[in-house]
Regions:
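CN hydrolase (nitrilase-like) catalytic-core segments centered on the catalytic cysteine
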Residues: 1, 10-101
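Active-site mouth loops of central-metabolism enzymes
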Residues: 4-6
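Glycine-rich, small/acidic residue-mixed loop/short-helix segments
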Residues: 105
Length: 137
């Protein structure tokens, strides 16, 4: 099963967890992640990479994250698309700023099952302990 996330969804762990609990083995992310001129480009890139690896690790899923490159008005999009495995390992990536490229990786979906069995991420959850996560802000 493939789950889809759009851009900013990546910043919210609940979205990825919900898809994983529904049986997703692979999360596909399409994003326009970048930074404004006054923002630190290194920080924006670090956030992007951290979110991808965190969603893969915390849910024991593959994440294929595609990010836009180029400029629009004053906003800069840096690319850095990547495929990450259920243990957070990078399977493939496209260097920053590369235009119109693609990455290919062979994904063993059995690795998702094995990782989940080993780490017990879903079984050890304690939903009553964090009911506030589903309350409106």
């Amino acid at each position: 099963y493939i789950g889809g996330l759009l851009g900013w969804d990546l910043a919210f762990p609940e979205a990825a967890r919900s898809l994983a609990l529904d049986g997703a083995d692979l999360l596909c992310v399409c994003a326009n992640w970048g930074h404004a001129p006054a923002q630190d480009p290194g920080l924006a890139l670090a956030e992007w990479q951290t979110y991808i690896h965190a969603r893969a690790l915390e849910n024991a899923v593959f994440v294929a994250a595609s990010n836009r490159v180029g400029e629009e008005y004053s906003y800069h999009f840096f690319g850095d698309s990547r495929i990450v495995g259920p243990r957070g390992e990078t399977y493939a990536f496209i260097e920053e700023e590369v235009q119109e490229a693609y990455a290919i990786a062979t994904l063993d979906l059995d690795a998702v099952r094995k990782t989940r069995e080993e780490l017990q991420l879903m079984q050890c959850r304690m939903p009553p302990a964090y009911r506030s996560l589903v309350r409106r802000y």
